[in-house]
């Protein structure tokens, strides 16, 4: 099914074959979870090329592809495969292949023109299958469980790094392969940093703590943000929290298929601006989510992407005021036929520990 969908794109891409080298797209197309392998796909043939270390693994995981073990030169074996498949215009992933690698392929592939392709497999990944959504739901559940656990762990005097370590350890104990990304734990004045990765700062009473994390599970990512208070926060921070809470709720309530990313972004941005905090919301409302934590479509002021059923996106408005603090709240949602469905379920009302 995936092979045929990719082949159906060949015409509009102006190619008759595709070289897939990025690990994420290789895994999506083949099911291979190792770190050394690529795929060559023509209109009627498909080969997966790897080395001795992964041949047996590939025979188990990769279906519908001829398994080829290269004898020492991956690039030469790839060139030989392209020639045997009769490919004349070979698409390659321009956003992931380095110039050096491109030059190496160009030196040995003589019978085919190398054609840069911006998006091929990524277009297929936009719409998730029911099986993919089930995995994403499980990744989201692991993150939800981790949030519930970390509420029992956080207290004044604990460092942000200790919180991040505990979150990752707990998610792994629940089946996650790893964290989806370098998680954010930003407390006190550091919560005004939208991407304030965990530091050695100690959490203090009265701090707001922004936790942005996710579980990487069976090749898919969850991505959740909650902001909690450790001790009583100031009235200003409570006000900011309520504005973000209401903006995020508007987004989750009204995002639906047929809407552009820009229209989805406006749902949260317009509310924050109306409350006087527009200058303090400087990032997009959300992004696509799947095998990578940041995928298309974007929910931003510049996005003309049309939301479709089966897409999975985040909704994560925030307010960040230097020398004061910040708040972000984020959920993962699946676009449905009539609206959307939330797959992260951690409480969003302000929690004061």
Curated annotation (Swiss-Prot):
Keyword field: Hydrolase, Manganese, Metal-binding
Organism: Bacillus subtilis (strain 168)
Sequence positions that bind Mn(2+) 2: 212, 223, 330
Pfam families named in the record: Creatinase_N, Peptidase_M24
Listed EC numbers: 3.4.-.-
Cofactor: Mn(2+)
Protein's name in the database: Uncharacterized peptidase YqhT
Keyword set includes Manganese: yes
Binding-site residues, Mn(2+) 1: 223, 287, 316, 330
Highest taxon in the source lineage: Bacteria
InterPro entries (UniProt xref): Creatin/AminoP/Spt16_N, Creatinase/aminopeptidase-like, Creatinase_N, Pept_M24, Pept_M24_MAP, Peptidase_M24B, Peptidase_M24B_aminopep-P_CS
Homology family: Belongs to the peptidase M24B family.
CDD domains reported for this sequence: APP-like
Cofactor note: Binds 2 manganese ions per subunit.
Keyword field contains Hydrolase: yes
GO biological process terms on file: proteolysis
GO molecular function, one term: metal ion binding
Taxonomic placement: Bacteria, Bacillati, Bacillota, Bacilli, Bacillales
